[in-house]
């Protein structure tokens, strides 16, 4: 009898959810009968010996990407209130908490995707079924000092101006002890497949042409500058 490896990991208690199981597989950390599993949907023997080479530091690989950005740009989130747009499983949120964020407002258009350990954490305010295109006055507290964004199936150029306006019209502070906010740091994960034209995206949603990727990033930078953001730089995630 064969089983999907992601299902098997959950059934055996090696992963708390299929999202977590898939992240472990994609990180190359799952072995079935001492052979590395390449795909989350890979079929393996139901009785296979399955082991994990090492635990991921965050609930998804996205956390490692944000960690890299924080280090690269020298951004400290300790003691700050943050907003995670497109939170999904919670990789970014997990990274923020592990780096000392005081509170995280986690927005996602879906429902119930966030890992339970984060959903049940009192420092996390879950805003499910929230399309961030509709961010408005009062949706963000006045003490938000950091925003991260990991969105799919929409261009971030549609969100950056909306986010800027929401920050300008933010509500009252959520934490009395949070540091006074003068500058808000924003980290955006740019996905070229959602920024490029339809004819520029290949099979599987992959943009292989370096020129298209550069142009997509440039469009995001131009949008950010036009919306009043100060663009510090970029990096490969």
Regions found by a protein language model. Name each.
Residues 1-46:
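A basic, amphipathic helix-loop patch mediating RNA/tRNA/ribosome contacts
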Residues 14, 71-78, 138-141:
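Glycine-rich helix-loop-beta junction characteristic of Rossmann-like nucleotide cofactor-binding loops
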Residues 78-88:
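Conserved class I S-adenosyl-L-methionine
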